[in-house]
Amino acid sequence: MTPSLSQPYVPHVGERSSQASRRRLDKRSQLRIWWREIDRVLLVLVLLLMAIGTVAVAAASPASARRLSTSAVKLDDLYFYWLHLRWQFLGILTMLGVSMAPKDWARRGAIVLCAAMLIGLVLVPFVGSEVNGAKRWLRFGISLQPSEFLKPAYAVTMAWILSWRVRDPRLPVIAIASSLMVLIVGLLMAQPDFGSAILYVGCWAVLVLLSGIDMRRIGALMGAGIVGIGATYLLYDNARHRIDAFLGGGTAYDQVDLARRTLMAGGWTGSGMWLGTRKLSLPEAHTDYIFSVIGEEFGLLICAVVVLVYLAIIARVLVRLVNEEDLFTILSASGLIALIGGQAFINILVNLQLFPSKGMTLPLVSYGGSSTIALCLTVGLMLALTRRNPYLSRDRFDLMAALAKEDRDKGGRH
């Protein structure tokens, strides 16, 4: 019997509709394409670093939990460890989800996020929550630190602005990018957040140099940077006290000196997990000074492994960009890895008492909520922007040749 045309077709038991089957095949195909194009080496290195962070937070959690417990509220020794697992789970989902986005979507999303977090940064001094003398968080049911989520969006937006130069060399891209950087740094210093301001300036400097700036301008930029550091020293008491303490040498009661002593206490092989004692006197053992906890409990050899993993991540991104043919991709990935690498090595230098204290976490290792999600977002953007078909050959991007071609094309039109 032929079914009526007015009745919907109902498949028999065990029969699949071709549309549903195609949809499943499309999803599988997209996953296969993603897995083929993604930088799997970078993904494995990041997951390795996060695994090290999981163990390190477990080691540091008892010290911080006991330090922050009160007579009214007693925190479980592994309180921060269990919270960290939740943040890591959300972070990995964020990283993988963002890494699947097409490059254009990743760029547009980052620009929108940059605008939204800039608004949040403007609101922080007025409605933000104050912690340890600084207003950095917005609280509306959850705590959000706009400066953390702004970092990856800022790097991509800055790369997008500087890449305009290829389309029209006459555009004042350096001035536009510099104005954005100055605006953000000014908002950060109002909190104040000197450590994040250094990262934003460093990211801007890396991208401006890579964009092919005239060498004659570098001296002027360096001079402006020196003036900015001097003004910060003179105008901000917190920054001046930290720099003076660093230059004057630590004392037994200085937290940076305590961090260095804790780091060295474990020797080459460490005292063993949960067997360290110096970490108990460290403030923020699970965040700012987790590298020192790693040194005390697991030894300097494991500290060296952590440093090598960071170097491997940086090297992998740079190798991936060697034959890249798109200026925007080169700049955005360079800016993102500059943020992660810069934050990592500032934190490590602080723990070694080679840099003034900045209140900065160790990326992908330290405990954190906003910082963990934001760093996983950073890696996700990096993975999305550097995706490529491994079977296609690529020509290395030449900025000078691109600018010369643009000039020739304009000359021909005139």
Segments (PLM) and residue ranges:
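Interfacial segments of multi-pass membrane proteins
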Residues: 162, 198-217, 278-302, 359-373
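Hydrophobic alpha-helical transmembrane segments
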Residues: 85-91, 296-317, 378
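Alpha-helical transmembrane segments of multi-pass membrane proteins, especially transporters
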Residues: 148, 173-177, 200, 221, ...
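Hydrophobic, glycine- and aromatic-enriched re-entrant/interface helices and adjoining loop segments
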Residues: 131, 135-137, 219-306, 324-332
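Transmembrane alpha-helix boundary/anchor motif
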Residues: 93, 101, 157, 230, ...
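Membrane-helix boundary/helix-loop-helix interface segments in multi-pass membrane proteins
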Residues: 2-49, 55-191, 348-363, 367-377, ...
